[in-house]
C-alpha cells in the first residue's frame, strides 16, 4: 500500500503524461506559424508498413505499463490528495478530439471551445478610448498593437486546414514512468469491477499474444478492447511462451490487406458522392476553417453519409476523409459579442473586406477600412466569421436572418476578373459598369486621373500674374479703360441700382412686382379674358344675335335615369329609355380622345401596310410569270403560256378589286402605295389600265392638296406611257367613260392633279390625231387655266421625256383650238419650258 501511495497519480495525470510526455521536441520547440501538415513524410519505410514490430518490446516504459496499473484502487484516499508528481496534466479543452469525423451529430461541437476562448480584442471597445462620438470607428487608441497595412495582412486562405497551435508541456526530468507493483489493477480491471463483470479470458489471452510473430490479427480482437487500452497496452505487451499457441481464426475473417482494400473502395465511393463542383470551389474563397479557430478539429462528416463498414475507424487507418465545405458556425449559434456597429456602415463591410484581402482600391465615396477590421482578421483569420460576428452584434434579432450570410462577390464585375475584362487599347480595366462611381472610368488610369487633378489644382491656384492666368480678360479690360470705361465697385453699383428703383414710377413698380409674381399675373390675365367674353356676349344679346331657346327642366332631364321629370297620365316619366340608338362611325370617332385616336390611326396604317406588302408579293409573282425563262426552283416552271396568262390575270384582278376602290385615295398619299399603283399599271392589260386611270381621276378629288406635287411626279409618267400606247378605240372608250361633272367641279376647286391628267390626255390626243380637243370645244369643257393660275412646272418635270419642240407645237395647237381660255392655257404651257 505504501508503494501505491508513493507512485500514486490521478487518471488525468496518467493520460496527460502518455499524450504529451513523449511529444517530439522538434515540434515543441518549433515556431507557432510552422504548419506540420505542410511537411512531407516518406511513406516507404518500415514504420509505415510494420517492419519494426519485432523490436517493440524494447520500450521498457510501455512494457511495464500493464504491471504498473494492475492493482489500482479507486477507493484509496490517495486519489483525494493533490499529486506530488512533476508532470502537470493539460486542460481538457487542449486535448485533441480523437475522431472528429464521427461525433454525436451536433454541428456546434466544433465551435464551442473556440468561442469560449479568451480574446484580448473582445475585452476592448471597437470605438477606441479616445473617441468623442458614438460612431467613430477610425480611432487610434485600441489597446492592441498598431493596425497592420493591407498588403502585410497574413490571411492563410490557401491552406486546407488551419495551422495547429502546438502547446509545449513542462520539461520533464525523466522520460520513463516509475514501475508500479505487479499486483496493481489495470484500467480495464477497474472498469470491469465498476460494471460488475469478470475479466474476459479472451482479453487475457490477447495480452500474452506475441505481436511480432502474427501477420494477421482477428477482427473480433481488434474491437473487443477499449480504444485507450488498444492504443496503450497492445504495443507494450510482453511476449510469453504460452502466446505462441494462437487461437484459430474464423473462416470469414479478413486479412489486413483485404480490410485496407475494402476501406479504400468505400472511401472512393464516398468521395464521388460528395464531390464539390469546381465553380463552387472557385467562388468560395473562404471555404476552410480560420487559423486559431477550432484548431484541432477536422471537418465534420455527416454520420448518415458514412458507409456501414467505416463506423469507429480512426483517421490513421489510411483513408482521407473528403472536404465537407467551409467550417462555419451553425445558424442559431451565439457568436462572441462585439460592440454594435452603426447600421450605415454594415453595407460597406464586404467592400472593406475586398479591399483588405485583394489589395484593391476602394470605390469613390467609400471611407477607408476601420482599424478594428484588420485586428479581427488577424485574430480569427476568417472574413466569413468576422462578418457574421459584426452582423449578429449590430442587427436586432427580430429583423436578423437565420445565421450569418456572407458571399464573396463574383461574376464579370468582381475585382478578381478585372484583368480579364480589360479591352485591348484601353488604358483602364474598368468599363461603363463603374461610371456610376467614377466618371473617368474606362478612359484613363487612376494615376493619370490623379495627375490630371493635380494639374487642374495648379491651374486653379494661378501663378499670380494676370497676364498668364487670364490674358484675354486683362486685354479686354485694358481696351475698355482706354475707351473711357471706369471700373465701379460693387457698393457703387448697388447704390446706383437702389436709386434707379427709388426713382421708378408706380406703374413701373407694379409691372416689376407682377413679373416677380407669375401666378398673380396669370390669374389677372384670366380675369381680364372672362370680362372680355362677358362683354362680347352681352353685345351679341343686345343685337339679338344670341337668343337661346329657354329649355325647361322636364325637357332637359327627359329619358334620364333617376332624375326628376314632369310626368302625367299621357306622358309618364321615362325611367329607362328603351329606344335603340346606333351612333354613326363619325360620332364614335369624335368621342375618342387624342391618345385613342392616335392608336386607332396607327392600327389602320399597320393594316394598310400589310395589305401593300401582300400586293407587292403578288406583283413579284406576276413579274416571274412574265419572264420567258424561269429558274429551276420556280413554282411556275411547268406551266404553259396560256396557264401563265391566266395566273397573271387572277393576280392582277385581286389587286384591282382590293386596292383600287375606296382606299385608293389613301394609297395615292403613301409612297409605297404609289409604287404599287405604278407597278400594277405596267403589268395589267390595256382594259385594266383604263380602269385604273379612271379610278385615279375619281379619287384625285379626295387627296390632300399638299400631296399633289408628289403624286404627279410618281404616277403621271407611267400614265402618259400607257395612255400613249392605247389603241384609238381604247382611248375613245377611256375619254367617253369620264365623268364630266366631277371633272368640272374638281377643276373649279383648283385640283392640280386633275388639271395635269387632263393636260396629258389633250397632249396624247393632239399627238395621235384624236378628237378630244374638238370634243372639248363642242362641250365647252371647263378651262384648264383654273382660278388659281397654278403653273405647269411640275407637269413639265413629270413629262421630261417629251422634247421642248413637241411642247411648243402642243401650245400652238391649244392656242388655235377654240376651247375655253385657249390663249391663257397656251401661255401657261409655254411658261413651263
Curated annotation (Swiss-Prot):
The keyword Signal does not apply. It is found in: Cytoplasm, P-body. Disruption phenotype: RNAi-mediated knockdown reduces the number of cgh-1-positive foci in somatic blastomeres. GO terms for biological process: deadenylation-dependent decapping of nuclear-transcribed mRNA; determination of adult lifespan; P-body assembly. GO terms for cellular component: P-body. It comes from the Eukaryota. One of its GO terms (molecular function) is RNA binding. Residues 279-313, 398-427, 492-549 are annotated as: Disordered. Transmembrane segments: none annotated. Residues 303-313 have a biased composition (Low complexity). Keywords: Cytoplasm, RNA-binding. The keyword Transport does not apply. Residues 398-408 have a biased composition (Polar residues). Its main location: cytoplasm. Belongs to the PAT1 family. RNA-binding protein involved in deadenylation-dependent decapping of mRNAs, leading to the degradation of mRNAs. Acts as a scaffold protein that connects deadenylation and decapping machinery. Required for the recruitment of P-body components such as cgh-1 in somatic blastomeres. May play a role in recruiting the decapping enzyme dcap-1 to cytoplasmic puncta in the cell body of the posterior touch receptor neuron, PLM. This is Protein PAT1 homolog 1.
